């Protein structure tokens, strides 16, 4: 009877060894050799301590920092709750949240049009980027709170605008964590 099960047993053990051990270890080794920063989560360090990842947004509050997109992933961009809100365009809850966020943003900068990404969450709820327009929209508030010149702050935002991937995929974006770290490093 064992002779009948032997080929199936050998096949399942070989498949398990290949797909469960050899392939994952090989890909991990290759990633560590070719892309060590990305393979380890694209971590950002300050004074030798990890302060975040280039790939996951953080909740910045207060007038002295640029704010990211609203997060549908719970408080503080909780990666364990990553996902969209699943609220449809006719959802009263979504409409109320967007109206509240819009009114708060409009009060902050009444002369400017509120960029959509400041009032809408991303699909994952963890997006670390905003559009350059969303960053520029926040310049007057941050400049006033930090006592900075708006022109200098706009120049800082300009330096943190990232081009689309490969020059043509997507739109220009600004990483909020990197921008806020540069803001702190500027000493204002």
Curated annotation (Swiss-Prot):
GO terms for molecular function: ATP binding; P-type potassium transmembrane transporter activity. Its main location: membrane. The chain crosses the membrane at residues 7-27. One of its GO terms (cellular component) is plasma membrane. The keyword Phosphoprotein does not apply. Coiled coil: none annotated. It comes from the Bacteria. It is found in: Cell inner membrane. Keywords: ATP-binding, Cell inner membrane, Cell membrane, Ion transport, Membrane, Nucleotide-binding, Potassium, Potassium transport, Transmembrane, Transmembrane helix, Transport. It is a single-pass membrane protein. Part of the high-affinity ATP-driven potassium transport (or Kdp) system, which catalyzes the hydrolysis of ATP coupled with the electrogenic transport of potassium into the cytoplasm. This subunit acts as a catalytic chaperone that increases the ATP-binding affinity of the ATP-hydrolyzing subunit KdpB by the formation of a transient KdpB/KdpC/ATP ternary complex. The system is composed of three essential subunits: KdpA, KdpB and KdpC. Belongs to the KdpC family. NCBIfam families: kdpC, PRK00315.1. This is Potassium-transporting ATPase KdpC subunit.
